[in-house]
């Protein structure tokens, strides 16, 4: 987890600024330590034990704002985790940050709250669809995986444009 946070610091905060992350989880290192202790005591807590993940800022992660990339929701703090977050945490995932998205979850990766997310390979280009922050974060090696949400190529386009693999979930 520390390696990913150091990379984010070097390339997102001090470096070329891809602008793929809205917020970092201030408790990520403590969660990693808790999982290390659990592993020593009884083994893996689940198949994603200790895997750093970025969540598209469209799903609630308790303790982190959910803004939908819009100034309209800049102060929204959810009281609990979204269902998918609960399941991933139960499998041992560590959420290290919230990824940028197209405002209100639509269109290109641009929002009134954070501006535009850039393509990792060409900072003059976009990162793709509304899950572009998730795609750019994984491509930049800011996390081992990310969660996006598919509408109209919202996962597929950022995956292709950022040189990573994306899986479009089935509906339902």
Predicted stretch roles:
Residues 75-79:
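Glycine-rich anion/phosphate-binding loops
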Residues 1-74, 105-106:
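Short, well-ordered alpha-helical
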Residues 80-172:
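Short glycine/serine-rich loop segments
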């Amino acid at each position: 987890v520390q390696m990913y946070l150091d990379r984010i610091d070097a390339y997102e905060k001090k470096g070329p600024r891809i602008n793929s992350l809205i917020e970092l989880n201030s408790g990520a290192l403590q969660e990693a330590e808790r999982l290390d202790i659990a592993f020593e005591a009884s083994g893996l807590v689940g198949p994603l034990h200790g895997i750093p993940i970025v969540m598209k800022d469209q799903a609630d992660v308790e303790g982190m704002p959910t803004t939908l990339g819009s100034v309209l929701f800049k102060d929204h703090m959810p009281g609990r985790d979204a269902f998918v977050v609960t399941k991933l945490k139960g499998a041992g995932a560590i959420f290290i940050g919230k990824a940028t998205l197209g405002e209100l979850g639509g269109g290109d990766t641009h929002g009134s709250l954070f501006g535009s997310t850039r393509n990792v390979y060409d900072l003059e280009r976009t990162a793709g669809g509304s899950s572009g922050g998730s795609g750019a974060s994984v491509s930049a090696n800011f996390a081992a995986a990310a969660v996006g949400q598919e509408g109209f190529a919202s996962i597929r386009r950022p995956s292709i444009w950022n040189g990573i693999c994306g899986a479009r979930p089935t509906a339902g």
